[in-house]
From Swiss-Prot:
Its EC number is 6.3.2.9. This is UDP-N-acetylmuramoylalanine--D-glutamate ligase. Pathway: Cell wall biogenesis; peptidoglycan biosynthesis. Coiled coil: none annotated. GO terms for cellular component: cytoplasm. ATP binds at G112, S113, N114, G115, K116, S117, T118. It catalyses: UDP-N-acetyl-alpha-D-muramoyl-L-alanine + D-glutamate + ATP = UDP-N-acetyl-alpha-D-muramoyl-L-alanyl-D-glutamate + ADP + phosphate + H(+). It comes from Salmonella typhi. The keyword Cell cycle applies. The gene is murD.
Length: 438
């Protein structure tokens, strides 16, 4: 465990994670300073009186005088103020690094462009089904520092590329990069390989690396080695097996579960299940209880979630599809009896939308594009696209045209922040309108 006594500590970013960092240091007899670029950041009213704070920007004087900066994942290491501090020799970490220095139980670490939250939650459910005292969080749910507990037997963490950039002490018992597709390109000026390099940090010092056999970008830089276990649709140690119209999860040649016993549906969710099973096996969770968890897990909100089924029309809320790869996963292998009414739009974060084009063929699909990058998305196939300012306008436009057998799918391929507070609010608005219009 690290010693922070007599250290001048500055925390950048409040909110729940920032407050967890403040509590962490106060519990160790260190009073940090806190700064936030927002004028009234969430959690400001919960800061103890003795903690100095600076809001509405960064305080370069504090940063340069610090021994340790704990930076929120929301601020880029390339920010001039952080670059100057780093050049002056100030150590810069994130909350995950603080956590890794303290955690005594094994850690399962999960990253990737898509599916992270589902796989993280699934592995957590597998551990609970086995009676293991598990802490689940990180980039979802509770901040990692709030999970620390001497009685924990296992930690399961979802980690973003931003969190991994400031983490060097992670020694995961099992780690995975589920997939790598363009996301956050506004934070990675050198492109996909720079983003990938941040993700691959999860494998450093890991005992077992769970890689995606269908995505070469998930392999460690030096290639697969004896630490690697693979999952995939048709290839890998953990893969899908299709026979006589049935689909099975298969492990090293052995059928272990028929997918019809799972509550989750869709090929992308079946591969998420394989990844979760590989991680659970890697840390010694009993196979029987892991498979039991797969049969009871109903999925997460806003992730290909059935919002309404009425008059033969299914309205699907996949608002968590905040990047192109996530929407590709939703469309890959999707079966619709009638017409697919696809809602796309929001803030594309400088992404290339062209990989979506191959899923937008045929005469049984209509596009409704909205938000900041609606025009770019409509340009993928203009003859079947209609562009509106807002998602609500798009839904009111399509509603009179849906027929039994159709599907209305919100899988926007974009972030929501141009028009919504977050992807959850976007999904809630979709669900409310589906119930009104359906």
């Amino acid at each position: 465990m690290a010693d922070y006594q007599d250290k001048n500590v500055v925390i950048i970013g409040l909110g729940l994670t920032g407050l967890s960092c403040v509590d962490f240091f106060l519990a160790r007899g260190v009073t940090p300073r806190v700064m936030d670029t927002r004028v009234t950041p969430p959690g400001l009213d919960k800061l103890p009186q003795e903690v100095e704070r600076h809001v509405g920007g960064l305080n370069d004087e504090w940063l340069l005088a610090a021994d340790l900066i704990v930076a929120s994942p929301g601020i880029a290491l390339a920010h001039p103020s952080l670059s100057a501090a780093a050049s002056a020799g100030v150590e810069i970490v994130g909350d995950i690094e603080l956590f890794c220095r303290e955690a005594q139980a094994p850690i399962v670490a999960i990253t990737g462009s898509n599916g992270k939250s589902t796989v993280t939650t699934l592995v957590g459910e597998m551990a609970k089904a086995a009676g293991v005292n598990v802490g689940v969080g990180g980039n979802i749910g509770l901040p990692a520092l709030m999970l620390l507990d001497a009685d924990r037997e296992l930690y399961v963490l979802e980690l973003s590329s931003f969190q991994l950039e400031t983490t060097s002490s992670l020694q995961a018992a099992a780690a995975t990069v589920l997939n790598v597709t363009e996301d956050h390109m506004d934070r990675y000026p050198f492109g996909l390989q720079q983003y990938r390099a941040a993700k691959l940090r999860v494998y450093e010092k890991a005992k077992v690396c769970v890689v995606n056999a269908d995505d070469a970008l998930t392999m460690p830089v030096r290639g697969a080695d004896e630490r690697c276990v693979s999952f995939g649709v048709n290839m890998g140690d953990y893969h899908l097996n299709r026979q006589q119209g049935e689909t099975w999860l298969r492990v090293k040649g052995e059928k272990v579960l028929n997918v019809k016993e799972m509550k989750l549906s869709g090929q992308h969710n079946y591969t998420n299940a394989l990844a979760a099973l590989a991680l659970a096996d890697a840390v010694g969770l009993p196979r029987a209880s892991s498979l039991k968890a797969l049969t009871t897990f109903t999925g997460l909100a806003h992730r290909f979630q059935l919002a309404l089924e009425h008059n033969g029309v299914r309205w699907i809320n996949d608002s968590k599809a905040t990047n192109v790869g996530s929407t590709e996963a939703a469309l890959n292998g999707l079966h619709v009896d009638g017409t697919l009414h696809l809602l796309l739009g929001g803030d594309g974060k400088s992404a290339d939308f062209s990989p979506l084009a191959r899923y937008l063929t045929g005469d049984r699909i209509r596009l409704y594009c909205f938000g900041r990058d609606g025009a770019q998305l409509a340009a993928l196939r203009p003859e079947i696209a209609q562009q509106t300012e807002t998602m609500e306008e798009a839904m009111r436009l399509l509603a009179p045209h849906v027929q039994p057998g159709d599907m209305v799918l919100l899988s926007p391929a974009c972030a929501s922040l141009d028009q919504f507070k977050n992807f959850e609010q976007r999904g809630d608005v979709f669900t409310r309108l589906a119930k009104e219009l359906g």
